[in-house]
Curated annotation (Swiss-Prot):
Gene it is expressed from: melC2
UniProt keyword annotations, A-Z: Copper, Melanin biosynthesis, Metal-binding, Monooxygenase, Oxidoreductase
Note describing how the cofactor binds: Binds 2 copper ions per subunit.
One MF term in the entry's GO annotations: metal ion binding
Listed Pfam families: Tyrosinase
Protein name in UniProt: Tyrosinase
PANTHER family for the chain: TYROSINASE FAMILY MEMBER, TYROSINASE-LIKE PROTEIN TYR-1-RELATED
A GO biological-process term: melanin biosynthetic process
EC number(s) recorded for this UniProt protein: 1.14.18.1
Binding locations of Cu cation A: 38, 56, 66
Length: 276
């Protein structure tokens, strides 16, 4: 069984193996396929805040969709090195630019002030190993501006305030909704998930956010929070369950796979566990 660990607890060898597997996926072209898929199916409508993609019903089921997306990526990593698991970044604890994940032996740090170019670590442009091929502009290098777009990452108190919400979601099931899903996604309230994307900056603040490997650690933590919410609220079911216009319901299939439903992805226990 795969165990997803807090990145702060990774050994030097676990970091090295994770980075090596990510770089191999980049080298063989599979990594950019994930970036392309995300850019196609997770796009923000600046007028409504809803997310979706060409030919996809809106809004897309944020938590189940990303659970499958991360499972596919984790399996791709394990096809390179079976010992690798996706680590998660608890940004409510590791909240500064000095956190261990930004070290040169792991993800590298923030970008330079002139253009955001990441200058250290294995994904810096100077290594020649990380060209940004799926992009929203002409810049071909990884960019970050840690703590510039928004000053503070979410606190544990803010996380707990969202975990305390007893309802998973409610109509109209979009960026205007109340409930756990929308507050975790970050369209309302303390803006958890979305705020982290903006805090990192660079490609993380765009539809091609998987260009930054921290994307996977961020979303792995979102899945951990979903699992924690489910433990706190065992009687709260997933909604919407059916017959909802312009929404992917519980038993609807999700693109791009077309063979998996939110109902198939409500629990992680068949696929992995967490170290907490």
């Amino acid at each position: 069984m795969t165990v997803r660990k807090n990145q702060a607890a990774l050994t030097a060898d676990e970091k090295r193996r994770f980075v090596a597997a990510v770089l191999e996926l980049k080298r063989n072209g599979r990594y950019d396929e994930f970036v392309r898929t995300h850019n196609e199916f997770i796009m923000s409508d600046t007028r409504t805040g809803r997310r979706g993609g060409p030919g996809h019903r809106l809004p897309l089921p944020f938590l189940p969709w990303h659970r499958r997306f991360l499972l596919d990526f984790e399996q791709a990593l394990q096809s390179v090195d079976s010992s690798v698991a996706l680590p998660y970044w608890d940004w409510s604890t590791d909240r500064t630019v000095r956190a261990s994940l930004w070290a040169p032996d792991f993800l590298g740090g923030t970008g330079r002030s002139s253009d955001g170019r990441v200058m250290d670590g294995p994904f810096a442009a100077s290594t020649g190993n990380w060209p940004v091929n799926v992009r929203v502009d002409g810049r071909t290098f990884l960019r970050r501006s840690l703590g510039t777009g928004v000053r503070e990452l979410p606190t544990r108190a803010e996380v707990d305030s969202v975990l305390s919400m007893a309802t998973y979601d409610m109509a109209p099931y979009n960026s205007a909704s109340d409930g756990f899903r929308n507050h975790l996604e970050g369209w309302r309230g303390v803006n958890l998930h979305n705020r982290v994307h903006v805090w990192v900056g660079g490609q993380m603040a765009t539809g091609v956010s998987p260009n930054d490997p921290v994307f996977w650690l961020h979303h792995a933590y979102n899945r951990q929070l979903w699992a924690e919410w489910q433990r706190r609220h065992p009687g709260a079911g997933y909604v919407p369950t059916g017959g909802t216009p312009d929404v992917v319901d519980l038993n609807d299939t999700m693109k791009p796979w077309n063979d998996v439903r939110p109902a198939d992805l409500l629990t992680h226990t068949a696929h992995y566990t967490f170290d907490v």
